Amino acid sequence: MENYPETQFIPGDSMIQNAIVSYSEESAGRERRTEANNVSASQERQALSRFGGVPQMQNIGQDFGSWRDQASDRNGFQLMSAMAGATGILQTGQGLSLSLGSQILPGIHQISHQNMAPRGNEYATQSFPGGNQNLDVVRTIPNSKYLKAAQQLLDEAVNVKKALKQFQAEGDKNNENPQEPNQSTQDSSTNPPADISQSERQEMQSKLTKLLSMLDEVDRRYKQYYQQMQIVVSSFDVIAGYGAAKPYTALALQTISRHFRSLRDAISGQILVLRKCLGEQQDGSDGKRVGIISRLKYVDQHLRQQRGFMQPQAWRPQRGLPENSVLILRAWLFEHFLHPYPKDSDKIMLARQTGLSRGQVSNWFINARVRLWKPMVEEIYKEEFTENDSNSSSENTPKMSEIGPVAADDEDRAREFSQDQTKPDHGHGYGEETRGMVQGSHMDGRRFMAVEPTYHVADTSRLGRGDVSLTLGLQNSQGQDNVVAMSSEAYNNFSGVDIYENAIPGDEMEYVNPGSRQNRINSSQLVHDFVA
């Protein structure tokens, strides 16, 4: 048995002392360590046999030594495979042998040659995640059953060759017939739309508005469907990964888009036909521009109508029409103030300007004529009447100034009359008892007055408007004083100067004598008495 010098050996000592060493030196040190381990294991077995140890301990020592050797070999292979994975040499998955030195054992070389490929593949997948997956995708795409359908969808949606061919064909047609647009414009100008009655035009306009609303509804529904499909696609992508929903949703989206496109094209064709009938699209070259302008007009009108018909909120009820609409309607009312009754064409025009309906416009004018127009007209007439009254009063003031002196003259005459009554009359045979006013004689609420027939009755203006009778002293047979009674109706007709001109009607006079004898005096008898 050979004796080896005892040396204190620590596994991995060389790696700790010098971290930067060559791979050949490391393998040589590993060989020395394995030999030393074998020697130490044999020495331990001898010591155990001397002390009468259990025979199973030999097997334990052998197992421990073999496990330690395998662990050291595994560490070496891991280092080699890590270096190969870092440099990218083992990406192809083939075996590769490295010459690490002249002292390498053949067993180690064979083990490394056998285990190199799988170790390299493991580290290749760890260092490049998705590398093999990309290769798998590249291999599976040509063999996929969805490839043909996807190619067809792409050809239908984006086909560069077909688009180029169509563009070239259109260019050739334009080059061959460059005067076609001019001819179409001439045809449209020379062939204006036939005369259409007002009712037919209104019907066509209503159809046009309905078709435009249908077109907007189709666009809105398609946008809604597209948004819902996008939500479904995003949910698929979150659960199954990016692009998982394309095979399921692309075909459905394409089919629905075709359906909406065909429906939209049909509605657009009907709209173009109606516009041509109405004469809105007159120029063929500017057809797109005219269509865009008419479209903008329709959108503007639609927005105004939506503002007009906008449903008010429950807590803030809408009162009346919008302010802009009311201003337009008021302007028209004041422009046509003398005749504020719009025609049907005026109502349609105002409805377009205000964004209201024809019924709303007519109702507003009905209310405005009652609430605005009629009070204003009444105020105007009232002002005119007040001006006329003021002018008439200013004209009547000088007449009253002329009447003033006449009344003064009457007062002077009355004074003279009273003075003459107090004087004795020598020219007549009447006594003083028949002169002047008779006081104290009242009969049935009537007042009597005895006046000589030669005197003018000028002082009657002082009497009131009650029942009044006049007694005139007349010469009659029997030599008695007779009086004539006058009723109040006859007296009421006397005023100022008229008393001298108007004759007393005979049927309203009575002949009264002091003996309570009454006889009606006819007009002829009165004349006879006055003459006598």
From Swiss-Prot:
Say yes or no: keyword Transcription present.
yes
Where do the segments described as BELL domain lie? 200-271
Where are the residues of the annotated region SR/KY domain?
144-160
Residue ranges for the region (Disordered) are: 170-203, 385-434
Which residues fall in a compositionally biased region of kind Polar residues? 176-197
Which stretches hold the DNA-binding feature? 314-376
One Gene Ontology term, aspect cellular component = nucleus
UniProt entry keywords in alphabetical sequence: DNA-binding, Homeobox, Nucleus, Transcription, Transcription regulation
**SMART domains, sorted:** HOX, POX
Basic and acidic residues bias: start-end ranges: 412-434
Query: Which SUPFAM superfamilies does the entry mention?
Result: Homeodomain-like (SSF46689)
Q: Which GO terms of the molecular function aspect are on file? A: DNA-binding transcription factor activity; transcription cis-regulatory region binding
Instruction: Provide the protein's localization.
Output: Nucleus
Which spans are transmembrane here? Answer: none
PROSITE patterns reported in the protein's UniProt record: HOMEOBOX_1, HOMEOBOX_2
InterPro entries xref list: HD, Homeodomain-like_sf, KN_HD, POX_dom, TALE_homeobox
Similarity remark: Belongs to the TALE/BELL homeobox family.
Describe the protein's quaternary organization and the partners it interacts with: May form heterodimeric complexes with TALE/KNOX proteins. Interacts with OFP2, OFP4, and OFP5.
Free-text comment about domains? The SR/KY and BELL domains are responsive for the interaction between the TALE/BELL proteins and the TALE/KNOX proteins.
Q: What is this protein called?
A: BEL1-like homeodomain protein 6
- The gene name on file is BLH6
